[in-house]
């Protein structure tokens, strides 16, 4: 019985019919000398107490050894043109970060909702809007600026009899078409105010023909 392996074994007998047995045993002994007892104790015990092996058995044992398997894995990557794990550039080895589009979509929805709510509040401030009229954002802005100009004109006429001067905001002239539209609107407003001397109480109304002029734009 062997003291190292713990199993009974036969003494090593060299047969002349297997000329590769001596070379295989020498290669196995050289491999065992490179390995420590702590790393591979089973292989060391097997090397001391193993029976004589034939060349086919020895080739089969090498195919199942860890060193041979690791070497074969490396050869397999190089054979198929692949790159072993961790051998590529440092920035390309890990998984690609996934873009979080959900957060961007939620921010965009909140921004759109805030803009729509602001335009809805602005439409409520414009008087005499027909119920069947659907105003776009650009028409809402145009009507709002026209209504502001209308209110400023009323305030200027009311302050002519007072001591303090009315506050006037200067608006830059953009183009000829816009200037012409403002002149027509001012003429219509002047004719409307001159025909109606009574001052309206509460919310100031807006004539319907002004709406007709604005909606044609």
Swiss-Prot record:
The keyword Nucleus applies. SMART domains: HLH. GO terms for molecular function: DNA-binding transcription activator activity, RNA polymerase II-specific; DNA-binding transcription factor activity; DNA-binding transcription factor activity, RNA polymerase II-specific; E-box binding; minor groove of adenine-thymine-rich DNA binding; protein homodimerization activity; RNA polymerase II-specific DNA-binding transcription factor binding; sequence-specific DNA binding. Residues 97-112 have a biased composition (Basic residues). The keyword DNA damage does not apply. Heart and aorta. Efficient DNA binding requires dimerization with another bHLH protein. Forms homodimers and heterodimers with TCF3 gene products E12 and E47, HAND1 and HEY1, HEY2 and HEYL (hairy-related transcription factors). Essential for cardiac morphogenesis, particularly for the formation of the right ventricle and of the aortic arch arteries. Required for vascular development and regulation of angiogenesis, possibly through a VEGF signaling pathway. Also plays an important role in limb development, particularly in the establishment of anterior-posterior polarization, acting as an upstream regulator of sonic hedgehog (SHH) induction in the limb bud. Is involved in the development of branchial arches, which give rise to unique structures in the head and neck. Binds DNA on E-box consensus sequence 5'-CANNTG-3'. This is Heart- and neural crest derivatives-expressed protein 2. It comes from Mus musculus. The lineage of its organism: Eukaryota, Metazoa, Chordata, Craniata, Vertebrata. The gene is Hand2.
């Amino acid at each position: 019985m062997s003291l190292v392996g713990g199993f009974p074994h036969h003494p090593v007998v060299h047969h002349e019919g297997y000329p590769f047995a001596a070379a295989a045993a020498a290669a196995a002994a050289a491999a065992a000398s490179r390995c420590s007892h702590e790393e591979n104790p089973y292989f060391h015990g097997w090397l001391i107490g193993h029976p004589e092996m034939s060349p086919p058995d020895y080739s089969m044992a090498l195919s199942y050894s860890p060193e041979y398997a690791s070497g074969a894995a490396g050869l397999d990557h190089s054979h198929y043109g692949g790159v072993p794990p961790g051998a590529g550039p440092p920035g390309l080895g890990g998984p690609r970060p996934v873009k979080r589009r959900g957060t961007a979509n939620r921010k965009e929805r909140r921004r759109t909702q805030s803009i729509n709510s602001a335009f809805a509040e602005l439409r409520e401030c414009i008087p005499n809007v027909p119920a069947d009229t659907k105003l776009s954002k650009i028409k809402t802005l145009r009507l709002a600026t026209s209504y502001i100009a209308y209110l400023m004109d009323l305030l200027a006429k009311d302050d002519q009899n007072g001591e303090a001067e009315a506050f006037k905001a200067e608006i830059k002239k953009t183009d000829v078409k816009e200037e012409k539209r403002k002149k027509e609107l001012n003429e219509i407003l002047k004719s409307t105010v001159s025909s109606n001397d009574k001052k309206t109480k509460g919310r100031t109304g807006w004539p319907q023909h002004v709406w007709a002029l604005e909606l044609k734009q």
